[in-house]
Amino acid sequence: MSNSDLNIERINELAKKKKEVGLTQEEAKEQTALRKAYLESFRKGFKQQIENTKVIDPEGNDVTPEKIKEIQQKRDNKN
């Protein structure tokens, strides 16, 4: 299991416990930290995926949004 999978598993365990019996202060802090770390990781991965996407219409024209093209161009110029 990856670290992300373990974090999701623990987040789910804490969510279930919260519904059933409640969480201690320490568990609530852990839940908040795990959720924050998960969201940061998700957003980073999603951003990378979007920034590496090229949109082509049925006629074969590149219709990638200009904002994405600008980000890709800046990234490519750095390398």
Curated annotation (Swiss-Prot):
The keyword Acyltransferase is annotated on this UniProt entry: no
Q: Which InterPro entries match?
A: DUF896
**Pfam families the UniProt entry points to:** DUF896
Localization in the cell: Cytoplasm
- Disordered as annotated region, ranges: 56-79
Q: What is its main location?
A: cytoplasm
Report keywords, A-Z.
Cytoplasm
GO CC, sorted alphabetically, is: cytoplasm
Ranges of compositional bias, category Basic and acidic residues: 64-79
Family note = Belongs to the UPF0291 family.
Name the chain's protein. Answer: UPF0291 protein SAV1341
Species whose genome carries this gene: Staphylococcus aureus (strain Mu50 / ATCC 700699)
Classification from the root reads: Bacteria, Bacillati, Bacillota, Bacilli, Bacillales
